[in-house]
């Protein structure tokens, strides 16, 4: 993928997030022949968001200005290791253990993997290969550019990045064999819409692997006052286990298998078989 274009095989992957039509490539952009929307390519990364962070009325997008700035430290000891111990507790899993556990849930999957709110591909880069294509989406262009730089430096093939929102994914129905959603489900404004959109683009029986937070027994998130303040000030929603299981059921997933370490929640579930849910 160069700065201006996608390869033919990559172009076939994406659809218009507005009308789900296949796209054409011209003049450095992806264009929809059905609804006429155009999505620019930015340093080789297709942008399906089309909104400047500084001008957005959406609090989730405004937060991305901060996320853009921390892209370079995101995978250092200054970020996740600290977050996991403060939020999850000192007895919770290490960052390396967490990555290994989550990617292990989809490691045996053959085919295409969607990496939701992928950041710089922290989880997806570990499993991307010529035989396992990983498509990461995030609203932070800073994170995506950092991920593209890491991917090139590490010589990884099979990792792709696009700027898109989880509520309007630029992929066709039933396209993916598995989905990762790591460190982000608790930040989505509408959890049900996000999960239903993930289910839409997954094949029946496909695996969903998630890392998020719960009101557990470790870290500051075990305190109700802290959870309330994090929700109010930062939009961080800490899930109860019955709550997240209900969200999954209402989104077309089954076989919820949670694992709690301190206040860190990892789980996997499967999209219901065809015919059991509307999508």
Predicted regions located by residue number:
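N-terminal auxiliary segments of SAM/dcSAM-dependent transferases
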Residues: 2-65
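Class I SAM-dependent methyltransferase SAM/SAH-binding core
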Residues: 112-168
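A short acidic, Gly/Pro-enriched loop at the edge of an enzyme's catalytic core
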Residues: 167-178
């Amino acid at each position: 993928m160069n700065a201006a274009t996608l390869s033919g095989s990559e172009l076939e992957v994406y659809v218009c997030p507005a009308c789900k039509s296949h796209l054409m490539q011209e003049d450095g952009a992806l264009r929809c022949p059905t609804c006429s929307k155009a999505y620019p390519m930015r340093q080789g990364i297709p942008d399906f968001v089309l909104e400047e962070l500084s001008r957005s009325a959406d609090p989730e997008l405004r937060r991305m200005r901060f996320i853009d700035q921390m892209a370079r430290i995101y995978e250092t000891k200054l970020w996740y290791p600290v977050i996991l111990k403060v939020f999850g507790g000192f007895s919770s899993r290490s960052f390396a253990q967490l990555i290994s556990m989550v990617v292990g849930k989809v490691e045996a999957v053959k085919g295409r993997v969607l990496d939701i709110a992928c950041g710089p591909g922290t989880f997806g880069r570990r499993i991307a290969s010529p035989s396992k294509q990983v498509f990461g989406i995030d609203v932070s262009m800073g994170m995506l550019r950092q991920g593209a730089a890491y991917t090139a430096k590490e010589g990884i093939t099979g990792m792709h990045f696009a700027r898109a929102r989880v509520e309007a994914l630029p992929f066709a129905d039933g396209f993916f064999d598995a989905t990762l959603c790591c460190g982000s489900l608790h930040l989505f404004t509408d959890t049900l819409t996000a999960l239903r959109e993930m289910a839409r683009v997954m094949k029946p029986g496909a695996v969903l692997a998630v890392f998020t937070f719960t009101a557990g027994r470790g870290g500051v998130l075990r305190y109700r006052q802290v959870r309330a303040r994090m929700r109010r000030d930062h939009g961080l929603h800490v899930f109860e286990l019955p709550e997240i299981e209900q969200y999954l059921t209402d989104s077309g997933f089954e076989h919820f298998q949670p694992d709690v370490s301190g206040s860190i929640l990892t789980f996997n579930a499967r999209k219901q078989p065809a015919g059991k849910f509307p999508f």
